[in-house]
């Protein structure tokens, strides 16, 4: 609470990353029932996720107690901690036993967010085959949707003109765009591996060019996301060890 209050004193909004799509076997709702092959006896989770890109165990949002728990969690963070909104991980997975997430997403926004905080942010990481038709509808209801423009930023970072201007939704209201995230490689790494001419071999050339991406990003309409440690010019792959982006850094920040 102190953290949120101090951020607000400085004009900084606090947005929580909420993972309502999936959970692991450590979750209490998983421990209430047999696990593994007997997951079918657990009403809180789907045996097989009805949507693409799933990880771990998939929450069954058709199960009324599960949905009630999610709504209460959103209410609680907004009223008790006064956070400014949420980024919903893998939002196209907020579905029940069939691949239809729209009604559940709308309920979470209306009952979980707007019912207690009219102006709170509700940002959806909305991928999947239905995103092209669903995202405009969600935006029209007041929500925001992720828009992945990393390839265009990669091209500019690497010094290639092809697709470097592909920012289809990047400057439109309702979309949250970004240069990098934990799901993609860092732009510095791409420039070091595949850069045009001296960009591939010359550190100074990369340092002079790649940070320009952030200038492009901040000039666009709406909110933008800055991926941690980009400010230090980290240029190693997120797969540089067995732990991926959660592994130890190959060199310390002070270096």
Give each language-model segment a name:
Residues 8-10, 73, 79, 90-181, ...:
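Active-site-proximal helices and loops of the catalytic beta/alpha 8
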Residues 187-203:
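Short, basic, glycine/proline-bearing loop/turn elements
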Residues 59, 198-199, 251-254:
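Glycine- and acidic
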Residues 1-82, 90-101, 105-117, 121:
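Substrate-binding/active-site clefts of carbohydrate-active enzymes
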